[in-house]
Amino acid sequence: MRMLFIGVVIALAAIWFLGPREPAQLAIDFTQINITSDIDAYLAEGESGFDDITPNTEKRVIWANGVGEKTSVALVYIHGFSASSEEIRPVPDKVAQALGANLYFTRLRGHGRSNEAMAEADVGQWMQ
């Protein structure tokens, strides 16, 4: 039994280290990002290119003190793989509320949409 366990561990380690890797550009060039003063409109414009977003999973900001009002702390919620902003709600909302912080829900490429949309994205696009 011990030899079987060791064999499985070695096989898994070999797969992990020798398996195929998806080449990806992981550096982000922030100089190309031009966010307008109306953040809600900026996010809505970016999401308008998709007609299959599940309701309430789009990129959005939950403003603590009114639309457009900055706070000293802001939280960014990045959901898990194949999930959406609704993954662990209302936990992020309660943390933001306790801190008096604005809360930004992002939506990774392909997430919060149809099953087919998940196949459209790659690692590099998830970094954008």
Model-assigned labels for residue ranges:
Residues 113-128:
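Catalytic nucleophile-loop/oxyanion-hole region of alpha/beta-hydrolase
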Residues 1-38:
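N-terminal membrane-anchoring alpha-helices
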Residues 26-70:
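N-terminal cap/lid segment of alpha/beta-hydrolase-fold proteins
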Residues 54-111:
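Short, surface-exposed "cap/lid" segments of acyl-processing enzymes
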